[in-house]
Regions:
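Short, surface-exposed acidic
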Residues: 36-50, 130-140, 193-194, 224
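Short, acidic loop-to-helix structural element flanking the phosphoryl-transfer center
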Residues: 12, 103, 113-119, 146-172
Length: 273
């Protein structure tokens, strides 16, 4: 196990995209969303979805999508303050080209959508192409993930590593998923009964800092004794670094380095080698 984790007292894990791997479920979701888009725009949607996954588009994980003005907002990785605004096609807009006080009004509430992880990519792309009222597509994807047709991608070494440190460290799950979904997934992953604390319906990123502070109080630890582990920079990593915690960020953009307190990995299994 990596020293960053070994030297900590509390490990805080996200669920989706962290405790299991793969993108098959995102692709399944995208195909359902494609059916909600008019036939003349469907191929453009699927092409853009592929470009975003291949990092060949203005939209990437860690940015905000303005669904009202169809704009993409780039954030400072530590402060999460807006710094640049792009069109969907990738044109950088000057302040003069934006509505008055536009930057100051950006937040995490609709019409602004933080693109925190892989779930948001197909959804935001579908909004760009006119899809509306598509929550049933997310529900259908979750239902598919509960069937035998879906093979959940396990993280190599995860269960063994957690079992080895369970008696010496506190292991916490902090997720936006609901209790029913969490219980089902943990059972599928054979990770049930490993966590000392499970926080569901977490309302990240709006309540991430509150949860972290509650964890510090509950386990009587200092910020630098906690590691937040996840694939969503906005939800899990930036709030942790802001409070003085450590972070493990799971991303394909492994050249990213914003802090000495942050370990960037392509796959979670790298920290268990």
């Amino acid at each position: 196990m990596h020293n960053l984790l070994m030297n900590s007292k509390v490990l805080v894990f996200d669920l989706d995209g962290t405790l299991y791997d793969g993108t098959e479920h995102y692709d399944y979701y995208a195909n359902l969303l494609a059916n909600e888009i008019s036939s003349d725009k469907r191929n453009s949607f699927l092409n853009d979805y592929k470009k975003i996954k291949d990092y060949d588009h203005a939209l990437t994980i860690g940015k905000i999508y303005d669904s009202e003005n169809d704009l993409i907002i780039s954030l400072d990785p530590i402060t999460l303050k807006p710094i640049q605004v792009f069109t969907w096609e990738g044109q950088l807009l000057s302040k003069d080209e934006l509505p008055e006080n536009y930057i100051e009004k950006i937040n995490y509430e609709l019409p602004y959508i933080p693109v925190g992880d892989g779930w948001w990519i197909p959804l935001v792309a579908s909004y760009h192409y006119g899809a509306k009222d598509v929550y049933h597509c997310y529900d259908k994807t979750k239902e598919y993930m509960a069937t035998k047709e879906f093979s959940i991608p396990y993280i190599k070494g995860l269960k063994d590593a957690l079992e080895k440190v369970k008696d010496t460290k506190k292991i916490v799950l902090l997720t936006n998923s609901d209790r029913e979904d969490v219980t089902r997934l943990l059972k599928l992953l054979n990770l049930n009964e490993l966590f000392h604390l499970e926080i569901t319906d977490g309302k990240k990123p709006l309540e991430t800092e509150k949860h972290f502070k509650n964890i510090m109080n509950k386990f009587n630890v200092k910020p630098h004794e906690i590691v937040s582990i996840g694939d969503n920079f906005i939800n899990e990593i930036s709030p942790a670094l802001k409070l003085g915690m450590h972070g493990v960020y799971i991303t394909n953009q492994t050249t990213m380095q914003v802090s000495d307190s942050l370990l960037v990995v392509k796959k979670l299994e790298e920290v268990f080698e």
